[in-house]
């Protein structure tokens, strides 16, 4: 990091991927700090650390959600992993639009600053990440905080749209000779399947929050029934974006998991084509289920029946992926190195999150469970243990390629077990709280809920210890790990991997390929 000009103006996909990773790590640390503050407040009944300031509690909730989704998971998963891996995996010299790639990243820091500054303006933005009116309207949040948060969303949305255009163009036009789509690794497939929903859904969000902005500042009434508007319109528009948005971090994660499970089982992925079509199905179906977040707003019974059925159908391609991973492991000689531990943890916990999703898909049950901690537990099992475990797995899998050094295996495994124990202890009790009717976004609760909340808060402290261990692993690897030569890549040579990233030096040269590789072999594993 000695030359700031190189990092500011770089158009190299590896440099920009590294910037995305660093940015994601910083945002992730901030988001984790907010989540620990939330859990400290909820550790016991009554007012604990926020002095009874319920608005501040909701500002923390809002900032935690935005930081984790828009500034940690998405930049690290799509910007970081995508930028580093996709050009190498398809045999391309770089991304299709390198300068667009640069601005895609540099739109994010100002966006983050706008979000953080919104918390410091007057009483902050305590709307939740959904920013639903009338709570986000000018009468309920009169200062500039919500406007600042909306501007932040606009900027990060532009960043994602530009990045998506870049990835789609790169993968469709810049594959090396012989690298057909059906020879591409599954991570390469997962990126355009992620980019298309982003490209289609973000403009809808932009429209919705622009309406909100004009309602707040220019006296329009899109969300105000007094002027002929409807707050439910905003909910439909937001959720049309918001539901594909929650699949967006998971799909590249599932691509990473496919690589890892294949490598450490010593077998090609079971049902490659099925995996591809399952990913595409999830990407398409994600657009058809948004109103399952809105079962309590007074939808027609036939509308609720449709959204219940459509939501349950998403479980089918998801199940295909889960069972294909299990079938890949079946009969393989499995090595439980750190990436594989995270991959198996991902499969197990993502499955639990999916099962609670099936419960919540029932519109009748959701009337009781909506906005309780059951929903919080569900989406954290999918995101906190799906997307984040996939990121950890991918980091340990490719870190040798990125740094040219091996990570300390024992410390990596300790990191896994502490984190696994911590997140489960945090989130599993939330199912019981939700079934008992404890509502979300409220910083105080009756004494009856005290036991499970105390356990949950204790689990969050353990998770922080695990995440600190991760940064220890990163520091040791980047500064003093064993150098990797082509002969001692930890697992690529053992498993005779034929994805392209293992065939270039570690770390890859500034310009990865002297000449474009010609792909003649379609098998992903040779015994």
Swiss-Prot record:
It is a multi-pass membrane protein. Ca(2+) binds at residues 41, 46, 443. Binds 2 heme A groups non-covalently per subunit. Binds a copper B center. Heme a3 binds at residue 378. One of its GO terms (molecular function) is heme binding. It holds the Pfam family COX1. Fe(II)-heme a binds at residues 64, 380. O2 binds at residue 247. It catalyses: 4 Fe(II)-[cytochrome c] + O2 + 8 H(+)(in) = 4 Fe(III)-[cytochrome c] + 2 H2O + 4 H(+)(out). One of its GO terms (cellular component) is mitochondrial inner membrane. GO terms for biological process: aerobic respiration; oxidative phosphorylation; respiratory electron transport chain. Mg(2+) binds at residues 370-371. InterPro entries: Cyt_c_oxase-like_su1_dom, Cyt_c_oxase-like_su1_sf, Cyt_C_Oxase_1, Cyt_c_oxase_su1_dom. There is a cross-link at residues 243-247 (1'-histidyl-3'-tyrosine (His-Tyr)). Its cofactor is heme; Cu cation. Pathway: Energy metabolism; oxidative phosphorylation. Its main location: mitochondrion. PROSITE patterns: COX1. It is found in: Mitochondrion inner membrane. Belongs to the heme-copper respiratory oxidase family. Component of the cytochrome c oxidase, the last enzyme in the mitochondrial electron transport chain which drives oxidative phosphorylation. The respiratory chain contains 3 multisubunit complexes succinate dehydrogenase (complex II, CII), ubiquinol-cytochrome c oxidoreductase (cytochrome b-c1 complex, complex III, CIII) and cytochrome c oxidase (complex IV, CIV), that cooperate to transfer electrons derived from NADH and succinate to molecular oxygen, creating an electrochemical gradient over the inner membrane that drives transmembrane transport and the ATP synthase. Component of the cytochrome c oxidase (complex IV, CIV), a multisubunit enzyme composed of a catalytic core of 3 subunits and several supernumerary subunits. The complex exists as a monomer or a dimer and forms supercomplexes (SCs) in the inner mitochondrial membrane with ubiquinol-cytochrome c oxidoreductase (cytochrome b-c1 complex, complex III, CIII). This is Cytochrome c oxidase subunit 1.
């Amino acid at each position: 990091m000695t030359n700031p000009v190189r990092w500011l103006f770089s158009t190299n996909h590896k440099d920009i991927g590294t910037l995305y990773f660093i940015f994601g790590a910083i945002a992730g640390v901030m988001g984790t700090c907010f989540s620990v503050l939330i859990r400290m407040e909820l550790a016991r009944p009554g007012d604990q650390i926020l002095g009874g300031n319920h608005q501040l509690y909701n500002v923390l909730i809002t900032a935690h959600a935005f930081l984790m989704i828009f500034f940690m998971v998405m930049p690290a998963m799509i910007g970081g992993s995508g930028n580093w891996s996709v050009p190498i995996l398809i045999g391309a010299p770089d991304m299709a639009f390198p300068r667009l790639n640069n601005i895609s990243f540099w739109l994010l820091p100002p966006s983050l600053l706008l979000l953080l500054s919104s918390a410091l303006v007057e009483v902050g933005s305590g709307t939740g990440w959904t920013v639903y009116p009338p709570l986000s309207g000018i009468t309920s949040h009169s200062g500039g905080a919500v406007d600042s948060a909306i501007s932040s969303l606009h900027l990060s949305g532009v960043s994602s749209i530009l990045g998506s255009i870049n990835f789609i163009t790169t993968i469709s036009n810049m594959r090396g000779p012989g690298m057909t789509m059906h020879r591409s690794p599954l991570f390469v497939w997962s990126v355009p399947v992620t980019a298309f929903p982003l490209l289609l859904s973000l403009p809808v969000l932009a429209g919705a929050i622009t309406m909100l902005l004009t309602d707040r500042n220019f006296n329009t009434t899109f969300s105000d029934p007094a002027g002929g508007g409807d707050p439910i319109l905003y909910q439909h528009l937001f959720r049309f974006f918001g539901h594909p948005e929650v699949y967006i971090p998971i799909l590249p994660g599932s691509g990473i998991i496919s690589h890892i499970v294949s490598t450490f089982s010593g077998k090609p992925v079971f049902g490659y084509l099925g995996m591809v079509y399952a990913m595409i199905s999830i990407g398409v179906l994600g657009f058809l289920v948004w109103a399952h977040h809105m079962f309590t707003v007074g939808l027609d019974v036939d509308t609720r029946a449709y959204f219940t059925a459509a939501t349950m159908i998403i479980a089918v391609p998801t199940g295909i992926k889960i069972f294909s991973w299990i079938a890949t492991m079946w009969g393989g000689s499995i090595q439980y190195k750190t990436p594989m531990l995270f991959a198996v943890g991902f499969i197990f916990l993502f499955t639990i999150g999916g099962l609670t999703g099936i419960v919540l898909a029932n519109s009748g049950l959701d009337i009781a469970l909506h906005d309780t901690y059951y929903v919080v537990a569900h989406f954290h099992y999918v995101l906190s243990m799906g997307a984040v475990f996939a990121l950890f797995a991918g980091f340990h899998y490719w870190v040798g390629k990125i740094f040219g050094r091996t990570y300390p295996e024992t410390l990596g495994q300790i990191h896994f077990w502490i984190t696994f124990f911590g997140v489960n202890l945090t989130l599993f009790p939330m199912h019981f709280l939700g079934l008992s009717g404890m509502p979300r976004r409220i910083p105080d609760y009756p004494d009856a809920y005290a036991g499970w909340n105390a356990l949950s808060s204790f689990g969050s402290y353990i998770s922080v210890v695990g995440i600190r261990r991760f940064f220890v692993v990163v520091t040791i690897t980047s500064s003093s790990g064993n150098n990797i030569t082509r002969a001692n890549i930890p697992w690529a040579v053992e498993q005779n991997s034929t994805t392209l990233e293992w065939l270039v030096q570690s770390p890859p040269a500034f310009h990865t390929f002297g000449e474009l590789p010609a792909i003649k072999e379609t098998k992903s594993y040779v015994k």
